[in-house]
Regions:
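Hydrophobic H-region at the start of alpha-helical membrane spans
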Residues: 6-10, 40
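Boundary of Sec targeting at the N-terminus
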Residues: 22-27
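Short, His- and charge-rich active-site/binding loops that engage polyanionic ligands
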Residues: 29-92
Length: 194
């Protein structure tokens, strides 16, 4: 089932990109973290895809963790994303795997602040619709006990739209899919322009 779903998502994504003139670039690097996996794109200096599992125990019953500073992910090739690349750009560092979803463990929480797990998001998106997807995903994990979350990042064929003086491409849109962990059935799907 998962294989066919992955193929259909890939085909739908390809059709969408053909119709809209969008293309996901190559040069991908797989980064495995304890709490999530990243498909990092060296040409855009951001992730193309992040995947993780979420259970209520991942975010419930734990005191709010102290916010950490974002860190350069040394596993990524140069030129790397740096925190200074976001300064005074009008974009925020939007988590792809939310820090709040990993608050049960200090190490898991801290690894969400690697710059390979963030992408430029408009403040309206990051604090509005994207936060709503995070909240609803937590709700689904409570209903289904455990869910699989896939976050997708789209950018236009032209990678000229970058943060000033940086290698970081500004995404065109973000997608999120939430599946049941046991049967891999699609529960919810979002596509949100940046």
């Amino acid at each position: 089932m998962r294989k066919y779903l992955a193929i259909s998502v890939y085909l739908l994504g390809s059709i969408f990109m053909i119709l809209t003139g969008m293309k996901i670039q190559a040069q991908k690097i797989h980064l495995h973290n304890k709490g999530y996996d990243v498909e990092y794109n060296a040409l855009t200096a951001i992730a193309d895809r992040v995947e993780y599992y979420l259970s209520p125990s991942d975010f419930q019953g734990h005191r709010k963790a102290k916010r950490k500073a974002f860190k350069v992910d040394r596993r990524t090739p140069a030129p790397r994303a740096k925190t200074s690349h976001y300064t005074n750009t009008g974009y925020q560092r939007g988590h792809l795997c939310p820090a709040a979803d990993r608050s049960q463990d200090k190490t898991l929480y801290e690894e969400t602040f690697l710059l390979s797990n963030v992408a430029p998001m408009s403040p309206a998106l990051n604090l509005g619709a994207w936060k709503s997807t995070e909240d609803y995903t937590r709700h689904l994990s409570q209903v289904y006990r455990r869910v699989r979350v896939v976050v997708l990042v789209w950018h236009t064929e032209s990678i000229a739209h970058r943060l000033p003086d940086s290698p970081i491409v500004i995404p065109y849109a973000f997608g999120k899919q939430v599946f049941t962990a046991d049967t891999d059935s699609l529960l919810q799907e979002w596509f949100i322009y940046n």
